[in-house]
Design a protein with these regions (language model features):
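Conserved SGNH/GDSL esterase-like catalytic core that processes O-acyl groups on lipids
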Residues: 17, 21-25, 58-282, 478-531
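Sec-exported extracytoplasmic/periplasmic mature domains
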Residues: 56, 60, 76-81, 224, ...
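Catalytic nucleophile-elbow at a beta strand-turn-alpha helix junction centered on a G-D-S/GDSL motif
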Residues: 42-62
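Helix-enriched interaction subdomains in cytosolic or periplasmic regions
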Residues: 1-23
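Histidine-centered active-site loop/cap adjacent to the catalytic His
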Residues: 48, 73-75, 235-237, 362, ...
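Active-site-proximal beta-strand/loop segments in catalytic clefts of secreted hydrolases
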Residues: 51-53, 239-244, 301-305, 385-388, ...
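A structural motif corresponding to the C-terminal end of an alpha-helix
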Residues: 222-234, 281-299, 344-384
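Mobile gating loops/cap/lid regions near enzyme active sites that modulate substrate access
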Residues: 305, 311-357, 367-447
Length: 531
């Protein structure tokens, strides 16, 4: 098959791990290594700084928009520091690059919950007009004018960025990539949208006159902004990177292992999965840079298994009883009955397993970095995001007891989420026209969390921060007692996909089945590597 062409290039250490049990999650963030608490006295000036990709940027439903509901912003609110936490904003046309939720609501307002065949031409026209408006706003309108800030953002995250991007990309490289935009009616996508998004994250000219600061440089500057007598300028630094070193295998349904030029900003663009060795080499560079940042506590997050995301849905039943994998993975709007491997894009079950195995090796490397740092006396911690998502994986484990590893236990959702009907799960979101009937943890792009999903991430990180001795405060400044919990009631109210999903997103996902071949939504919203 076409997508098996590079199967011979599968790294030897990945092949050696086939048929092994999945990696067991780390349950002790300190890795059973005691370290003297990283600093005493009042908290440093910058209580929270994050370095990451789309999962930290606040991306959902194909766009970065509600950055005030990213998991870093949620944590900052619970810290009692929300009014000081600086993050980029994308206020127009549902954000960048294309807000699928807003598009579906536009179509629902015009055509109702069901799109009849005779309405298809008008619906196509309406959708293209919406996309043209977004293109005009960000390329030639108010969105084309970047903000001038007087300080460095605390959320230093850019969707689509992998380890190499964080090591090397700057405002200058992003500006150099921008071209004179063209108003193309057929290819309606905001040109260079990733660079435009990054320019709202990176320090502006008023802070960085020559535009040569990387995200790591920016974090280092924050770490150097120390009050008298303090060793650190940052209290907690969260590093959550690596998903984009494997995610394109799922978004493109194609496995191309990294090779020559993988450290080059342009040369790496043809690869969809990094070999574990290449990942380790770049991770070592990243960890060295993080060691230079003056942060009291550092939390590293592991890479989630991207094949669990519902954008790639397993079809044709599990390969055998007790297997974690399906024979094929394709788009969620293609039914088992309709799927044809000769016609439809897909990954094979073996490819999905190989990608997961590579991610397990990435996570072993991240764990090793934390372990060595703790042995050196640094107050570093591990947040095992991969294990968290594994415990929420509906089709892989929850609905198939035979596939569960011996260590597996279901993740206990917070009481406010358990009270929802139906209880949120990792299926693709669906509604009956009036209410949510399935899913709830993943947004409409099938990869990124909903607002409540980001709340779960925030809660796990808050628990680690409390273990590190970080104080969370009420609005009046008083210290919050343990356990410190996220205000999920607030997040539910803000999460429109939970409390009022688009009425045209019915269980068959017919509107997406129409929109994807017609509008190329996945390509427009998730082929967003910085290249």
């Amino acid at each position: 098959m076409a997508n098996d062409v590079r199967a011979a290039d599968t790294p030897r250490e990945v092949k050696a791990g086939r048929e092994q049990q999945p990696r067991e999650p780390v349950t002790d963030p300190a890795l059973n290594i005691d370290v003297h608490p990283g600093g005493q006295g009042p908290p440093p000036r910058h209580r929270l700084v994050t370095i990451g990709d789309s999962l930290t940027h606040g991306f959902q439903s194909g766009a970065v928009f509600h950055t005030d509901l990213s998991y870093p912003a949620i944590i900052a609110d619970e810290l009692g520091w929300g009014g000081h936490f600086r993050y980029p904003c994308y206020p127009g046309y549902g954000g960048l690059p294309l807000n699928i939720e807003l598009l579906l609501r536009e179509l629902e307002d015009r055509f109702g919950q069901d799109l009849d065949w005779w309405e298809t031409p008008l619906a196509l026209f309406q959708a293209r007009r919406f996309m043209d408006g977004a293109e005009d706003y960000w390329e030639r309108g108010p969105g084309a004018i970047g903000p001038r800030t007087t300080g460095i953002n605390h959320n230093l995250s850019v969707y689509g960025w992998d380890l190499r991007d964080v090591l090397e990309r700057t405002a200058k490289t992003c500006r150099d990539a921008l071209q004179a935009p063209k108003d193309n009616w057929l290819q309606q996508v905001v040109e260079n949208h990733g660079d435009r998004a990054a320019l709202r994250v990176l320090p502006s000219d008023s802070v960085d006159g020559n535009g040569r600061l990387t995200l790591l440089d920016a974090a280092q500057r924050l770490g150097n902004e120390r009050d008298d007598g303090q060793e650190h300028g940052i209290e907690t630094l969260i590093v959550f990177l690596g998903a984009n070193n494997a995610l394109q295998a799922v978004t493109q349904l194609k496995v191309v292992w990294s090779g020559e030029g993988y450290k080059d900003l342009r040369g790496k663009c043809s690869y969809t999965v990094w070999t574990p060795q290449h990942f380790r080499e770049e991770l070592e560079e990243l960890a060295e840079r993080v060691r230079e940042i003056k942060a009291r506590h550092v939390i590293w997050c592991t890479v989630p298994h991207v094949t669990i995301a519902p954008l790639a849905r397993g079809v044709a039943g599990k390969t055998e009883p007790g297997s974690r994998y399906f024979p094929y993975y394709t788009r969620p709007w293609i039914s088992d009955r309709d799927f044809n491997p000769l016609l439809h894009p897909h990954l094979t079950g073996q490819q999905a397993e190989d990608v997961d195995r590579a991610i397990d090796l990435y996570n072993d490397a991240i764990t090793d970095q934390v372990r060595e740092a703790r042995k050196d006396g640094r107050d570093w911690y591990l947040m095992d995001t991969a294990g968290l998502l594994d415990r929420l994986a509906s089709r892989r484990y929850i609905e198939d007891p035979l596939a569960r590893p011996t260590w597996w236990q279901p993740y206990p959702l917070p009481p406010q989420l358990q009270a929802l009907s139906p209880e949120p799960n990792s299926h693709f979101l669906a509604s009956d026209g009036t209410r949510r009937t399935d899913g709830g943890l993943f947004s409409l792009d099938g990869v990124h969390p909903t607002t409540i999903g980001y709340g779960i991430l925030a809660q796990e990180l808050i628990t680690i921060m409390r273990r590190a001795g970080v104080e969370f405060r009420h609005a009046d400044g008083s210290v919050r007692p343990d356990p410190v919990t996220v205000d999920f009631s607030r997040l539910i109210r803000r999460d429109t996909l939970i409390n009022q999903p688009p009425g045209n997103l019915t269980s068959g996902l017919g509107v997406l089945a129409w929109a994807e071949p017609t509008l190329s939504l996945v390509q427009r919203t998730l082929y967003f590597r910085a290249c």
